[in-house]
Curated annotation (Swiss-Prot):
GO terms for cellular component: large ribosomal subunit. Transmembrane segments: none annotated. Part of the 50S ribosomal subunit. Keywords: Repressor, Ribonucleoprotein, Ribosomal protein, RNA-binding, rRNA-binding, Translation regulation, tRNA-binding. InterPro entries: Ribosom_uL1_bac-type (IPR005878), Ribosomal_uL1 (IPR002143), Ribosomal_uL1-like (IPR023674), Ribosomal_uL1/biogenesis (IPR028364), Ribosomal_uL1_3-a/b-sand (IPR016095), Ribosomal_uL1_CS (IPR023673). Disulfide bonds: none annotated. One of its GO terms (molecular function) is tRNA binding. Binds directly to 23S rRNA. The L1 stalk is quite mobile in the ribosome, and is involved in E site tRNA release. GO terms for biological process: regulation of translation; translation. Belongs to the universal ribosomal protein uL1 family. This is Large ribosomal subunit protein uL1.
């Protein structure tokens, strides 16, 4: 722990906590201050001036990052018949029906994305208490309840991310790995920011983005100037 603390202190010394950096400067600092012994994920965080208690100010959706996330997603699909075969052909890791419900209820959670055809939601609904808190419940807004299972699987495997504002208006998303070229991280960050800008509720008042930051796993948080995005 002492060694890690020393590394963190060294990283913190390189970052001015009172400054909002340009996206290019922030990404460069993320790479420079990373001390994890593995390929750390890079995450962005937004604090939005919204009231999620109001139905028209809830922000939730999905997008495909131009350069992917660097993570191999394990995709589970609830489907039957031809749609099950379609999911398998598209590269889904797990495909099934009641058998998967029983397995998940038994404690199995070795997957990252859950997709379902609309007709399967009746049985998937039984898993609400398990999948809901983990943000894994299929939802039409994120494209995970769909008849086009092949497209959904391919997008999930190809860098699709989901996002959702929490009760405090915070939105977080992984935009890549520290090993990515800086320009690819910048491009992913800007693409996600574009989605955040377009997601602004028409009824939101005042400054929309009150804070934007970027960090890496076990790394330091760096404030980002939204105007640079």
């Amino acid at each position: 722990m002492a060694k890690k603390s020393k590394q963190m202190r060294a990283a913190l010394e390189k970052v001015d906590s009172t400054k909002a950096y340009s996206v290019e400067e922030a990404v460069a600092l993320i790479k420079e201050t990373n001390f994890a012994k593995f390929d750390a994920s890079v995450e962005v965080a937004y604090n939005l001036n919204i009231d999620v208690r109001k139905a028209d100010q809830q922000i939730r959706g999905a997008m495909v990052l131009p350069n992917g996330t660097g993570k191999t997603q394990r995709v589970l699909v609830f489907a039957r018949g031809a749609k099950a075969e379609e999911a398998k052909a598209a590269g889904a890791d797990f495909v099934g029906e009641d058998d998967l419900v029983a397995k998940i209820n038994g404690g199995w959670l070795d997957f990252d994305v859950v997709i379902a055809t609309p007709d399967m939601m009746a049985i998937v609904g039984r898993l609400g208490r398990v999948l809901g808190p983990r943000n894994l419940m299929p939802n039409p807004k994120t494209g995970t309840v769909t008849m086009d299972v092949a497209k959904a699987v391919e997008e999930s495997k190809g860098g699709k991310i989901t996002y959702r504002a929490d009760k405090a208006g915070n939105v977080q998303a992984i935009i890549g790995k520290v090993s990515f070229d800086a320009d690819k991280l910048v491009e992913n960050f800007k693409a996600f920011n574009d989605v955040m800008v377009k997601s602004k509720p028409s009824t939101a008042k005042g400054t929309y983005m009150t804070n934007v930051s970027i960090t890496s796993t076990q790394g330091v948080g760096i404030k980002v100037d939204p105007s640079s995005l």
